[in-house]
Amino acid sequence: MDPGAGAFSEEQFREACAELQRPALSGAAWELLVETQGISVYRLLDQQTGLYAYKVFGVLEDCLPDLLADVYMDLAYRKQWDQYVKELYEKECSGETVVYWQVKYPFPMSNRDYVYVRQRQELDFEGQKVHVILAQSTSEPQFPEKSGVIRVKHYKQRLAIQSDGKRGSKVFMYYFDNPGGQIPSWVINWAAKNGVPNFLKDMVKACQNYKKT
């Protein structure tokens, strides 16, 4: 996949916004994996790869939507609060902004890295502002693969955020990647059951500390 500057269509943004309002879990074998801290995580087996795609729904309290979207987009700040970031930066390539992200994996597994494009839009849904952020892997020669690090070549994420009507954020997230290599099933299960809710919890804490930095 080698998306250009128009990597995402307006329809993709609208679909993410719509799923925030009404979860699309019927018509496919989505199964509830875990409910914790106000967050529900569902998974769907991808028959082609044998891996799972994930959908996350829930409310993050005491974290306003504008702030949450800003924190999510701020790569420099993420390096301060996300303990799994080894390297993270963005670079202009052929007229578009490309993100390089290297993730720490537990020993003895190799770290993974991602090269991806992302876009953010603000949509209106019945008078409410909805932040939608889309990301997907891309191929860019300015980011050659590194020795000892496994490149994740299939990565896709969708995030939609709006007010919960109080001082929190209602969120929807879709996530799929193919990390490659031989990863024990316990690591994958842990990441889905604990990693995603913990990441969102850490992001709420990061929101509360954002203006202090």
Curated annotation (Swiss-Prot):
It holds the Pfam family START. The modification Phosphoserine is found at residue 139. Transmembrane segments: none annotated. Keywords: Acetylation, Cytoplasm, Lipid transport, Lipid-binding, Phosphoprotein, Transport. CDD domains: START_STARD2-like (cd08910). One of its GO terms (molecular function) is phosphatidylcholine transporter activity. The keyword RNA-binding does not apply. The keyword Phosphoprotein applies. A 1,2-diacyl-sn-glycero-3-phosphocholine binds at residues 72, 78, 157. The modification N-acetylmethionine is found at residue 1. Residues 171-176 are annotated as: Part of the binding site for phosphatidylcholine. GO terms for cellular component: cytoplasm. Residues 1-212 form the START domain. SUPFAM superfamilies: Bet v1-like. InterPro entries: STARD2_START, START-like_dom_sf, START_lipid-bd_dom, START_lipid_transfer. GO terms for biological process: phospholipid transport. It is found in: Cytoplasm. Catalyzes the transfer of phosphatidylcholine between membranes. Binds phosphatidylcholine in a tight 1:1 stoichiometric complex. Interacts with ACOT13/THEM2. This is Phosphatidylcholine transfer protein.
